[in-house]
């Protein structure tokens, strides 16, 4: 045999053995959970580093230093809490609703909820997105609170403060202490967030505009005319709700809902009750029912092009038809999906199935045994706090710098002069957290994003099962607040997913998608710590009838 051929054969054989040995070594390394996590972390760090370099190339000229930050539009709730009903205490509630879709649509509209190339341009309206508002007071003379919800993917704190500022006169005149606006988080509505438009076009344009600071004119998935109409309509609806306030009684029930929902992320915790907050007016008028439920409205899927409210819209429509004014308020729904199988008959079209699911929940709530509802004494206490979160997630930072989203960011530095260009500053996201306590028995935790359920009710991974091998050492929001709890998610802001620190993993790890669209790995602990501080402060400023309050 030719010596060269023999040498080549030996070399090829050795190469094959070498490749196999290398593959076996890699396979053996990947079989170790610790090594697999290390590789995932390396990938995560590399990806975030790349995005960070891109973010660093975009000007942040438009973001103020902390001492120049203007928080006009922020409302902190009650100045003090009361334990017992006031002398003339009585529940007063008002309701109003309106479509936020303009009568004439001009320009491009994108469906908000799915990242698509090309983007999902709206080509029709299946049903109109709504704003629904409920004004509430305990007639203690301390003021009015408003809870409103918009059928949309999410709405930023900046846009919410714009709505509040449109009713500045009403806030002063009627002593409105808090205006809390949330999103149903439907993934089939017109984009109100900004991330779901023509991203390549926006990146190229907005990078130039960012250099102009506040004078820049960025583009995003949001239609400016639509957003203007939405804000004005929301403001008018809140005014109408306050105008419609009437006396009555308030009840609540925790209604089992576990087989209507399912969690897609371990440890598979769901809030297995929905909360029904039911107002019965003295004059025999329409009841108001606010339904707090955690489930993603993503039923129409990735390529749906017709704007729709998804199942929350059908739920409210069914209640409206029955003569009940209704609100659907999204809960701790991070990775929680609908479970339509047990309740929806076979053979329905997609839209028929979604409609049937929403109507089934509405019928279930309206038919629930009224004797199971607890009557709430007329006492409402609300506290809201601003929270500054370090913008750790470079994806969020890039989106904010490019003005694809308009969440408020500020620069925090040690420089004495707020105008000084000090490269040591860091960017912080400004958001809001808060809670309302009704009748000393039900707390509504107002959270600015998509909350992992175990943060609300417990059940987080222990150290041996979590991504980082550590315990989640924070109490649940229910433990902190010490009452029955309902969560108002995506409330007063839209900052993405809120994941327990101990399980905040690589964006490349299986079942860890949520980390890609989260403010950062310490977001959950910072938010829970804020709730602890708010509860401690509320306890300090709680008074009873025997104490004298000097305003």
Task: Report the location of each language-model feature.
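Hydrophobic alpha-helical topogenic segments used for membrane insertion/localization
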Residues: 2-26
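Conserved beta-alpha junction segments in alpha/beta enzyme cores
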Residues: 23-182, 186-356, 369, 375-551
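Anionic-ligand-binding alpha/beta catalytic cores of soluble enzymes and soluble regulatory domains
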Residues: 361
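Glycan-recognition surfaces in beta-rich domains, encompassing non-catalytic CBMs
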Residues: 365
């Amino acid at each position: 045999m030719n010596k060269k051929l023999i040498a080549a054969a030996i070399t090829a054989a050795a190469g094959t053995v070498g490749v196999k040995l290398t593959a076996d070594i890699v396979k053996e390394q990947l079989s170790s959970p610790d090594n697999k996590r290390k590789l995932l972390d390396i990938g995560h760090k590399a990806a975030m580093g790349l995005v960070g370099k891109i973010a660093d190339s975009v000007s942040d000229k438009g973001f103020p230093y902390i001492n120049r930050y203007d928080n006009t539009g922020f409302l902190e709730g009650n100045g003090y809490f009361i334990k017992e009903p006031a002398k003339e205490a009585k529940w007063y509630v008002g309701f109003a609703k309106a479509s936020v879709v303009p009568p004439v649509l001009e320009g491009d509209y994108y469906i908000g909820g799915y990242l698509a190339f090309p983007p999902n341009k709206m080509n029709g309206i299946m049903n109109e997105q709504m704003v629904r508002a409920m004004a509430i007071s305990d007639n203690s003379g301390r003021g009015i609170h408003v809870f409103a919800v918009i059928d949309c993917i999410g709405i930023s704190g900046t846009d919410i403060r714009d709505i509040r500022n449109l009713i500045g006169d009403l806030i002063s005149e009627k002593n409105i202490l808090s205006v809390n606006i949330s999103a149903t988080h439907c993934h089939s509505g017109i984009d109100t967030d900004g991330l779901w438009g023509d991203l390549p076009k926006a990146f190229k344009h907005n990078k130039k505009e960012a250099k102009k600071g506040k004078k820049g004119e960025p583009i995003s998935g949001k239609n400016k005319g639509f957003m203007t109409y939405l804000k004005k309509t929301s403001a008018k609806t809140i005014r109408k709700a306050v105008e419609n306030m009437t006396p009555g009684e308030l009840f609540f029930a925790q209604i089992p809902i576990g087989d209507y929902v399912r969690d897609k992320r371990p440890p598979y915790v769901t809030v297995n009750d929905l909360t029904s907050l039911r107002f019965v007016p003295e004059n025999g008028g329409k009841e108001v029912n606010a339904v707090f439920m955690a489930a993603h409205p993503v039923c129409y899927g990735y390529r749906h092009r017709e704007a729709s409210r998804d199942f929350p819209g059908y739920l409210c429509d069914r209640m409206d038809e029955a003569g009940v004014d209704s609100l659907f308020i999204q809960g701790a729904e991070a990775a929680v999906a609908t479970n339509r199988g047990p309740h929806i008959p076979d053979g329905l079209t997609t839209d028929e199935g979604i409609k049937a699911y929403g109507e089934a929940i509405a019928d279930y709530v309206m038919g629930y045994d009224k004797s199971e509802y607890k009557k709430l004494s007329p006492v409402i206490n609300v506290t809201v706090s601003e929270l500054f979160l370090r913008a750790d997630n470079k994806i969020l930072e890039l989106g904010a710098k490019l003005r694809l989203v308009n969440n408020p960011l500020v620069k925090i530095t040690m420089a004495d002069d707020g105008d000084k260009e000090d490269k040591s500053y860091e960017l912080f996201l400004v958001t809001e957290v808060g809670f309302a306590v009704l009748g000393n028995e039900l707390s509504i935790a107002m959270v600015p994003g998509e909350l992992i359920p175990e943060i609300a009710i417990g059940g987080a991974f222990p150290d041996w099962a979590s991504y980082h091998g550590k315990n989640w050492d924070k109490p649940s929001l229910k433990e902190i607040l010490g009452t029955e709890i309902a969560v108002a998610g995506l409330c007063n802001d839209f900052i993405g997913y809120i994941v327990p620190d101990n399980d905040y993993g690589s964006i490349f790890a299986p079942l860890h998608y949520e980390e890609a669209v989260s403010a950062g790995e310490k977001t959950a602990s910072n938010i829970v710590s804020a709730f602890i501080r708010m509860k401690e402060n509320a306890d300090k400023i709680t008074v009873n009838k025997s104490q004298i309050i000097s305003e």
